[in-house]
């Protein structure tokens, strides 16, 4: 990732819900400024209150958790659904969505 892309990602509040714990750990290494809320329905709804983008990885997440995340996100936030665990593809999808 270029420095310009990194600064670009750093300028947004991006939250991630879903995916396996192993995937979230790996994603946190690649995207250290993103906020990871886990895959359980019991996350704090207020955590998403300031989100610019909410990524929902539909692998290893319940339908109830997905719906809670969608409903908790501000109306101004973009919801990005993915079922792909490839972090490079996730980065590309984010850049396409944001630009």
Kindly give the residue locations of the regions a language model identified:
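Glycine-rich, N-terminal phosphate-binding loop of Rossmann-like dinucleotide-binding domains
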Residues: 58
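Short glycine-rich, flexible loops that bind phosphorylated cofactors or substrates
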Residues: 62-64
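Ser/Thr/Gly-rich flexible loops in soluble cytosolic domains mediating phosphotransfer, phosphorylation
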Residues: 74-99
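Redox- and metal-dependent alpha/beta enzyme cores, enriched for Fe-S-associated oxidoreductases
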Residues: 2-43
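An anionic, turn-rich surface loop/hairpin at beta-sheet edges
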Residues: 39-46, 70, 79-81
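Short, aromatic/basic amphipathic alpha-helical patches
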Residues: 27-31, 66-73
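Alpha-helix C-terminal capping/helix-to-coil transition sites in glycosyltransferase folds
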Residues: 49-50
């Amino acid at each position: 990732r270029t420095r310009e892309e990194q600064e670009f990602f750093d300028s947004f509040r991006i939250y991630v819900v879903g995916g396996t714990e192993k995937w979230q750990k790996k994603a946190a290494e690649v995207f250290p400024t993103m906020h990871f809320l886990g895959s359980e329905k019991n996350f704090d709804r207020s955590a998403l209150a300031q989100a610019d983008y909410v990524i929902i990885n539909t692998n290893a997440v319940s339908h109830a958790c997905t719906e809670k995340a969608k409903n908790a996100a501000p109306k101004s936030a973009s919801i990005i659904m993915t079922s792909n665990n490839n972090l490079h593809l996730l980065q590309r999808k984010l850049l396409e969505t944001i630009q």
